[in-house]
Amino acid sequence: MNVRQRYREILKGPGLTFAPGAYDALSARIMEHCGFKVITAGGYAAVGSLLGEPDGGQSNYREYADHYGRICDAVDLPIFCDADTGFGGVHNIRKMVRAFERAGVAALFLSDQVFPNRCGYMPGK
C-alpha cells in the first residue's frame, strides 16, 4: 500500500488522528519515532527552516517539492503538505501537484487567497 492509500485508510479509521507539523527531515523522524501515523508539513515551517523568514511568497513550488521530498524520504509516513495558493494559475497548480506527487507527498491543501500569498501570521493580512 502506498502512502496515499495509507493516508486514506487512516482518515477512514475511527477516532481522531493527530498530525504534528514537521519543518524538516529530522523533526519528521522524531515524530515518526514518537508513534505518530501522519505528519503535516506547512509552508511557514518550510520557508522558516530554509530561509529563516516568514512565508511571504518568496519560494516557488519546486523549492517546496524538494523540501517536502526530503521529509518524505526520511520517514515511512504519509505527509500532508501546504501548497500555499498553488503558485499561480491552473497550469502552475497542475505542475505543482505533479511535483509534489513525485516528491512522495500523500496529500496537500491549498490556501484560498490571492497569489502570491500573504503570510497569515503577519500584520496586514
Regions found by a protein language model. Name each.
Residues 2-9, 13, 52-81, 103, ...:
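Alpha-helix-loop-beta-strand connector modules within alpha/beta enzyme cores
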Residues 20-25, 58-63, 84-103:
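Glycine-rich anion/phosphate-binding loops
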Residues 18-24, 39-41, 79-83, 108-110:
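Hydrophobic faces of well-ordered beta-strands that scaffold small-molecule active sites
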Residues 35, 104, 109:
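Conserved functional loop/turn residues at catalytic and ligand-binding sites
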Residues 1-21, 25-34:
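N-terminal amphipathic alpha-helix/helix-capping segment at the start of soluble metabolic enzymes
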Residues 38-63, 85-90, 109-125:
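Glycine-rich, proline-tolerant flexible connector loops at the mouths of alpha/beta enzymes
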